[in-house]
Amino acid sequence: MIRHVDFFSAINPEDSNAIFDGLSILANIPHASLFEVTRNLKVDKINGKDPDFIVYAEFTNQEALDAYKAHPLYKKSISIVRPLRDMRIAADFLG
């Protein structure tokens, strides 16, 4: 299994709902066996620059992850979120 995690922050806090809605589009892509988009609770006060959103997904294999990233809804989500985001950090790991 491949676990995929993305962290995002908004340039402008007023765009938070638009970013959340744009990321939520990804839930309609059929290739993930588990998919979540959530807002960061920001309870850890050690970090100075916390992400605003987390995307977490699990895929059965690399082919499923590749198909997810090639899906038209993935591209639609990027077109909405990219202009509004400040930071994006992504990680893929075996689980």
Model-derived regions, located:
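C-terminal structural segments of small proteins and small subunits
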Residues: 58-94
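Short S/T/G/P-rich N-terminal loop/turn motif that feeds into the first structured element of a domain
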Residues: 1-53, 60-70, 94-95
